[in-house]
UniProtKB/Swiss-Prot annotation:
Annotated EC: 2.4.2.1, 2.4.2.2
Superkingdom to which the source organism belongs: Bacteria
Protein name, entry field: Pyrimidine/purine nucleoside phosphorylase
Catalytic activity: a purine D-ribonucleoside + phosphate = a purine nucleobase + alpha-D-ribose 1-phosphate; adenosine + phosphate = alpha-D-ribose 1-phosphate + adenine; cytidine + phosphate = cytosine + alpha-D-ribose 1-phosphate; guanosine + phosphate = alpha-D-ribose 1-phosphate + guanine
Entries under SUPFAM superfamilies matching the protein: RmlC-like cupins
Record family assignment: Belongs to the nucleoside phosphorylase PpnP family.
Main enzyme class: transferase
Organism: Serratia proteamaculans (strain 568)
Gene behind this protein: ppnP
Length: 96
């Protein structure tokens, strides 16, 4: 079953699904902008196209992730993103 999600007045959209090979996952696109997300489960984010500038929980420095690169966000935390150009991503929701 597909679940369509929309955030930040439509500037971030994703389609969630449960994959037998990789588990609970969403794939989406972020338009240019700055965003703050919170997590319920641990997340593995992979950039597909574009780039994400990320401030991870507990980190004093922003990091840039390019296509094929991934980062991890702990459960029950908040992280910030800066997007300079439309960027596609894959998000895997990891077990607790």
């Amino acid at each position: 079953m597909l679940k369509v999600n929309e955030y930040f007045a439509g500037k971030v959209k994703s389609i969630g699904f449960d994959s037998s090979s990789i588990g609970l996952t969403s794939v989406g696109v972020m338009e240019e902008g700055e965003y703050t997300f919170t997590t319920a489960l641990p997340e593995e984010m992979t950039v597909i196209t574009g780039a994400l500038k990320v401030l991870l929980p507990g980190s004093p420095d922003w990091q840039v992730f390019m296509p094929g690169e991934k980062f991890f966000v702990p459960a029950h935390s908040e992280f910030n993103l800066q997007v300079a150009d439309a960027t596609a991503y894959l998000c895997r929701y990891l077990s607790k």
